Amino acid sequence: TTMAPQLFHRQLEDGAWAITVANIHQLRLCRHWGINRVLMANQVVGYQNISDLCLELRDNPEFDFYLLADSCQNVDQLAEAAKTYGLSKPIQILVELGFPDGRTGCRNTDLALEVARRIKSNEPYLILKGVEGYEALLRTRPEPEDSIRIFLKDLNLLAEKIALEGLFGQGEIILTAGGSDFFDLVLEHLEAPSGRHEVVKVIRSGCYLTHDSLAFNRFFEKMKHRNDKVSQASPGLLPALQVWGAVQSIPESGLAIVNVGKRDVSYDVELPIPEMYFRPDKDQFPQKMPEGCKVTLLHDQHANMAVPTFPEFQVGDMIGFGISHPCTTFDKWRLMY
């Protein structure tokens, strides 16, 4: 989640169905920035969080908001709060299907059906508006693509069973999945349930917006190999996020210390990679980083950068780093250019 209002509005202007958030304070910021449709791809739990949500929905009944549920306890909590706050419209809920050893989400379709029935039993305070899953965590399984296809089949089966029992509310229903690794498989295998429901399919590949130079770039290359339509898209997804710093010390041969550290750039997946350099009193434009230069260690405020093939580096040279995992770089900055 970028938490950048200009980027949110650019996405919506370009046709994004909604903005996705993970918690209540992100929701508050979206509302402050005038976002009128939000999907919280998470459960809302805790007295204060549920109360804040109900106040927002009570005071702004036109706000189109969706959240996830994977337990009957949470459903009952939401229903009680909706009743207490006298909401004029029901809280819109998607049942979340998960998988064993995953994250949140009902561990099988039978459990998910119980949650769907509980939502139905709490009308008119709640309304079941669809089903949701997050398949990207299956990337670590021995056969990830097969595991994802099986999971999407279960997601389709859940939607079908809910439709057959008449548990969905009136109006269109939402089917949503699709992390940035496998959204092509979601588009291929996510199917609308039979019946008269109008269906909106929503993929949530949030990292498409900035992409990166490492992890998600590799995921996209794999996607191009397995999907001809993706490979034919030119130029495809390109990295759009760099973090720049300056060489502040060259304490020994082959080593440059750059003033970029863990407080400035993501490191939870991989260390950043130096991509460009610029000497302010010499270069007119940034130059491509010589091969062999790499970050070997990241401290709070500094990066150790091995420069075995380019001894000409000087203190004051600017270095542009490509990143791995945009989300945990965005959260380190209040302003980006």
Name the predicted role of every residue range.
Residues 30, 95, 131, 175, ...:
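Conserved, mostly hydrophobic/aromatic
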Residues 41, 178, 206, 259-261, ...:
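Generic beta-strand/beta-sheet core signal
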Residues 58, 80-83, 87, 117-125, ...:
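Generic secondary-structure signature for well-ordered alpha-helical cores
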